[in-house]
């Protein structure tokens, strides 16, 4: 049921806004469900799992790994000391060969322990920590009495080295991930559609907040919208490429200062039949991707963002952000997201704009080049000179024929001479009634 506003007009409920496929910060809004053997697959690639996990979870995992290893080997050392009988000896018993406790007699010889000064589980745990971390206080140590204790010390040292190397490698890989470099790559909040070089174009702006370059930087864009095939198959996330200059190399950019990426809306564009009104009612999302290698690590990074139909401003352009100073160029990032409206931007689609240009305003023929124009002038002047020479020669012939001035034939000859046609002059000479005297004179000559 439609609601009513305060002024009495009916209020039409707006259509539910579609969920983003890619968020503005570049994260993909996708949740994986019902994965079979997910834990086994993730544990099979434990290194990538640790690198992809959050810092707090990774620190918890390694802290638990160290604690478990210390407890395990501490329990192992305690068991060795327990079964060897080291825990039953009194701490005050003198060592073998020591002075007597009293009476001047020989002191009883105490059995040599496997681990010196380990009288309980706490002592065994401390010895385990000292062994794995190579602290080496020197108070507790293993004797040659128990080979099993020696083997346990060797195994714990190897396990400690493995855990340390794995932890250091994972932390370094996580810190050097190019994903964090994408945090300093910036996309404009809005995309715009306006006329550039006589054609409607979709434009958005990208920038690099660091002075270090992105090597081999290039951009891509895809339009994502629901699509129904001719067979009735529904595709909720159909992807269409938006050409940003792949064929002529405009997709490769030198990202030192902010650059406006341009998609020309032509016949191959999914936006070709979309005008301003259709844009306001369409349900689509444009995903923009910037890829390149980090200059410091040579690792590939990717920054992503997206624009919904409501985030595309029709008839707007971006404000300039690069200004030339005395000795350098200044980039004002306070203007990075700002746009201004362009008056006179057509509200029709690119198809309608192209058809109107063809039917109403045909393109004028291309002007001749300067070289052709000069040749044409030279040819015209040469033809005029030839016409003047032919006219002079015809006048001399007419004077030799002895025509009477003012006669009709002479007037016709003069007109033909002025016209400059040699063939007409010959036909006129053949039709003139020449007298016998003149003819004989010509023949005699």
Swiss-Prot record:
Swiss-Prot/TrEMBL keywords: Cell membrane, Cytoplasmic vesicle, Ion channel, Ion transport, Membrane, Postsynaptic cell membrane, Potassium, Potassium transport, Synapse, Transmembrane, Transmembrane helix, Transport, Voltage-gated channel
SUPFAM superfamilies attached to this UniProt entry: E set domains, Voltage-gated potassium channels
TM annotation in the entry: 56-80, 149-170
Catalytic activity: K(+)(in) = K(+)(out)
InterPro entries assigned: Ig_E-set (IPR014756), IRK_C (IPR041647), K_chnl_inward-rec_Kir (IPR016449), K_chnl_inward-rec_Kir2.3 (IPR003273), K_chnl_inward-rec_Kir_cyto (IPR013518), Kir_TM (IPR040445)
Main location per the UniProt record: membrane
Oligomeric form and interacting partners: Homomultimeric and heteromultimeric association with KCNJ2 and KCNJ12. Interacts with DLG2 and DLG4. Associates, via its PDZ-recognition domain, with a complex containing LIN7A, LIN7B, LIN7C, DLG1, CASK and APBA1. Interacts with TAX1BP3. TAX1BP3 competes with LIN7 family members for KCNJ4 binding.
Family: Belongs to the inward rectifier-type potassium channel (TC 1.A.2.1) family. KCNJ4 subfamily.
Name of protein: Inward rectifier potassium channel 4
